[in-house]
Each structure stands twice: as structure tokens, then as C-alpha cells.
């Protein structure tokens, strides 16, 4: 039997089968018979040859796939590059907008606008009190529908939205309900008057409200606490009885505010609010509060932490502090309502009380402008002195400046 000849140096670029030779095995001699393929050595050599070419084709296939991946890789990189570029462009646009908003020019314009509106509001309010007191409730309503949505928007953006659930906002809504829905309700009038002249008015002192014309936030806080008693002062003491008879009949029915009845009505309303506040805020939003969302309780705890009452509350167990705060807030509300009969029965006392509260906010505003701006200017001056002191050539100027 002739030996099977196998070409081991066959070019790997060719196919295993020769297309122009009736599918004969490439690399085998044509003289080999078909029966010779069943010889054991020849079978092994054929197998080796097939295995070698299989591995070569497998390598070529992997190389082709790898080459296609390499071709697609630049496209993939280009897509990632364009995506990152788009993200960067959007980020820069947002940063640019934020920078423009916080820039000195925009802030100055915003402060100027706020200052102009604040001064104009004070002047218009004074004119209405003196010339058209029967229109004060309209002026109050217009401002309330401006300030409350603005307060909700700004506080929600800052994470202060739980302050909106405070008793002061309920007091304003209650007064709005009395003015426009139930002006004939005697009990609702007594409740609104007691809360306005009690809790709301004294909150100017407790919350340290300031008359800062350049700050919408400060003006809003002062409006929420001071305007309700001012509106009721004009209704009770400055409005004609003929107008009251048609528009606010409950005022004429109340000859005087009895302390016991006012405390009883206010206590019932306060209890309803406090129950709602505890379950909706203290319990329902406990996780958010623990994560750092401020409430009136956390703010007052920090603001009065150095006082005797603040230190006493801080020494109590953590789970008891909110309940103690509720009791203190209730006692504060009832205490501030005690002199309401004086304000209601005497026009002069009511005027003096409102002047005192408003003067307190003016003093707080003056303290802010002088102390805060003064300290800021002092820091800038100290930084300038330090900069001049670090420059040897300007030592003379530094000493002259320090004098």
C-alpha cells in the first residue's frame, strides 16, 4: 500500500476543502486511494491535519471578531465622549445659571426689589390704616395670597417645609375663614382675636422677627405674625359701626372678651392642631426629622439652648422632649392671651401694644444691619490688614491703616 502523503506546510489561508478538486482533502496526494484512508497511521495523520486547520480557522475567526470589536471601539468611545460632553455642557449651564443668580448683580437687584416692595408696603399700610381702615382686610388678603405660596415654595426648596405646619399659619388661615366665610360667628371672632393678639403677636419676640426690607423671607415672617392683630385692630377700633353691622356683625355682638371663654375656645382649637401636628409631623415625618429636617421644636431648642428653660428641657430623655415642648407651647399661648381683654376694650392700649411689637421688629432689624454688616466689614478689614502685613513693601501702609 502506497504511503499517504500529507503536506504539513499547507497555507493556512486556504480552506480545508479544495473547491476546484471535487472537495478532495487539500494537502493529500491524489494517488491515495479511498481504502488507504482507513489505514491507522493515515487516519491519525488526517486527524492531525484536520485538527491543525481547525485551530487555524478558529484563530482566524477570533481574530476577525477581535478586529470587528476594534473597529467598533472608536464608535463606542465617540458615543461615550459625546454623552460626557453633553452632561458637562448641561452641568455648566446649570452652574452658570446658579452663578448668575447668586452673582452680585442679581443679588443686588433682588435685594433692591425686595427693599422697594417692603418700603412701599409699609407706606401703603400706614395710609390705609389712617385713611381707609375698612379696606385693611382686603389688603391683608391680597398679601396673604402672595406671601404664603412664596413661603411654601422657598421653604420646600430649602427643606424647611415642616415649618408651614406651625400654629401661626393656622392662625392666619383661621382669620381668613372668619373674614370671608363666617364674619357673623361670635366664637370664631373671639378665637381669631385671641390667637392674633396672643400667639401671633408675641411670636415676633419669640422668633426674633426683624424688619429687613431687603429680605423677602424676613418680611414674610413679620407679615404672618404682625398683620393679623393689625387687621383686627382696624376692624375693632377704627372701622365705622355702620360698616361693621353689614360686614362684620360678630364684632358688635362682642361687647368685651371674657378671659375664661377665650381661653376655653383657644384651648380646644390648639388641642386639635397639636394632635394633628404630633401625628402628622412628629410621628409621620420622624425619619426625615432624624435625618436633619428642621421643625419649630428643633429650631427653638437650638435658639434657646443657652437659657435656663432650654437647658432644663435638654436634660430630659429624648422621647419626652417633644411632649414637654407641647406643654410649654400651650402655656405660652394661653399666657399671651391673658391681656387680650385689655387690647379689645381699650383703643389706646391696643395701639401701644402694636407699636411695641412693631418697634421690637424694627430694633431687631437695626441690630442685624449694624451688627451683622459691621462684623462682616470688620472681617474684611482684618483680612486686608493681614494681607498688607504679609507684604514687606507695604509694611508702612499696614501700620498706618492699623492706626
From Swiss-Prot:
Segments traversing the membrane: 113-133, 138-155, 162-182, 187-207, 219-239, 263-283, 323-343, 353-373
Subcellular location: Endoplasmic reticulum membrane; Golgi apparatus membrane
Key words of the record: Acyltransferase, Endoplasmic reticulum, Glycoprotein, Golgi apparatus, Lipid biosynthesis, Lipid metabolism, Membrane, Phospholipid biosynthesis, Phospholipid metabolism, Transferase, Transmembrane, Transmembrane helix
GO MF, any single term: glycero-3-phosphocholine acyltransferase activity
Record protein name field: Glycerophosphocholine acyltransferase 1
A cellular-component GO term for this protein: Golgi apparatus
Organism per entry: Schizosaccharomyces pombe (strain 972 / ATCC 24843)
Family assignment from sequence similarity: Belongs to the GPC1 family.
Glycosylation sites noted in the Swiss-Prot or TrEMBL record: 240
Catalytic activity annotation: sn-glycerol 3-phosphocholine + an acyl-CoA = a 1-acyl-sn-glycero-3-phosphocholine + CoA; sn-glycero-3-phosphoethanolamine + an acyl-CoA = a monoacyl-sn-glycero-3-phosphoethanolamine + CoA; sn-glycero-3-phosphoethanolamine + (9Z)-octadecenoyl-CoA = (9Z-octadecenoyl)-sn-glycero-3-phosphoethanolamine + CoA
Role of this protein: Glycerophosphocholine acyltransferase (GPCAT) that utilizes acyl-CoA to acylate glycero-3-phosphocholine (GPC), forming lysophosphatidylcholine (LPC). Shows broad acyl specificities with a preference for 16:0-CoA, polyunsaturated acyl-CoA, and the hydroxylated ricinoleoyl-CoA. Also catalyzes the acylation of glycero-3-phosphoethanolamine (GPE) with acyl-CoA. In addition to acyl-CoA, GPCAT efficiently utilizes LPC and lysophosphatidylethanolamine (LPE) as acyl donors in the acylation of GPC.
The protein's Enzyme Commission number: 2.3.1.-
Gene Ontology biological process terms in this record: phosphatidylcholine biosynthetic process
Amino acid at each position: 500500500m502506497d504511503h499517504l502523503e500529507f503536506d504539513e506546510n499547507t497555507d493556512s489561508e486556504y480552506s480545508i476543502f479544495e473547491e476546484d478538486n471535487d472537495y478532495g482533502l487539500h494537502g493529500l496526494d491524489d494517488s491515495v486511494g479511498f481504502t488507504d484512508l482507513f489505514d491507522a497511521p493515515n487516519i491519525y495523520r488526517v486527524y492531525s491535519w484536520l485538527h491543525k486547520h481547525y485551530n487555524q480557522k478558529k484563530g482566524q475567526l477570533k481574530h476577525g471578531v477581535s478586529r470587528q470589536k476594534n473597529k467598533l471601539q472608536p464608535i463606542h468611545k465617540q458615543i461615550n465622549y459625546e454623552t460626557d460632553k453633553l452632561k458637562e455642557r448641561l452641568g455648566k449651564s446649570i452652574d452658570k445659571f446658579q452663578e448668575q443668580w447668586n452673582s452680585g448683580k442679581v443679588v443686588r437687584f433682588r435685594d433692591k426689589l425686595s427693599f422697594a416692595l417692603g418700603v412701599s408696603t409699609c407706606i401703603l399700610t400706614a395710609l390705609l390704616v389712617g385713611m381707609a381702615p375698612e379696606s385693611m382686610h382686603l389688603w391683608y388678603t391680597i398679601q396673604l395670597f402672595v406671601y404664603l405660596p412664596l413661603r411654601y415654595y422657598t421653604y420646600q426648596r430649602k427643606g424647611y417645609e415642616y415649618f408651614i405646619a406651625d400654629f401661626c399659619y393656622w392662625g392666619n388661615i383661621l382669620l381668613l375663614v372668619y373674614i370671608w366665610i363666617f364674619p357673623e360667628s361670635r366664637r370664631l371672632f373671639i378665637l381669631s382675636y385671641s390667637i392674633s393678639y396672643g400667639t401671633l403677636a408675641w411670636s415676633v419676640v419669640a422668633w426674633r422677627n426683624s424688619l429687613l426690607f431687603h429680605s423677602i423671607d424676613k418680611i414674610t415672617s413679620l407679615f404672618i405674625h404682625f398683620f393679623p392683630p393689625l387687621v383686627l385692630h382696624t376692624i375693632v377700633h377704627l372701622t365705622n359701626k355702620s360698616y361693621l353691622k353689614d360686614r362684620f356683625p360678630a364684632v358688635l355682638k362682642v361687647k368685651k372678651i371674657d378671659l375664661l371663654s377665650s381661653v376655653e375656645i383657644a384651648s380646644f382649637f390648639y388641642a386639635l392642631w397639636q394632635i394633628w401636628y404630633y401625628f402628622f409631623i412628629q410621628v409621620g415625618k420622624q425619619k426625615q426629622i432624624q435625618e436633619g429636617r428642621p421643625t419649630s421644636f428643633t429650631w427653638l431648642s437650638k435658639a434657646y439652648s443657652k437659657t435656663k428653660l432650654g437647658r432644663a428641657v435638654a436634660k430630659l430623655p429624648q422621647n419626652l422632649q417633644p411632649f414637654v415642648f407641647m406643654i410649654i407651647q400651650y402655656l405660652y399661648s394661653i399666657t399671651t392671651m391673658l391681656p387680650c381683654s385689655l387690647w379689645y376694650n381699650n383703643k389706646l392700649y391696643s395701639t401701644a401694644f402694636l407699636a411695641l411689637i412693631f418697634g421690637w421688629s424694627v430694633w431687631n432689624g437695626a441690630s442685624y444691619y449694624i451688627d451683622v454688616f459691621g462684623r462682616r466689614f470688620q472681617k474684611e478689614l482684618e483680612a486686608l490688614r493681614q494681607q498688607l502685613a504679609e507684604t514687606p513693601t507695604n509694611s508702612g501702609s499696614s501700620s498706618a491703616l492699623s492706626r
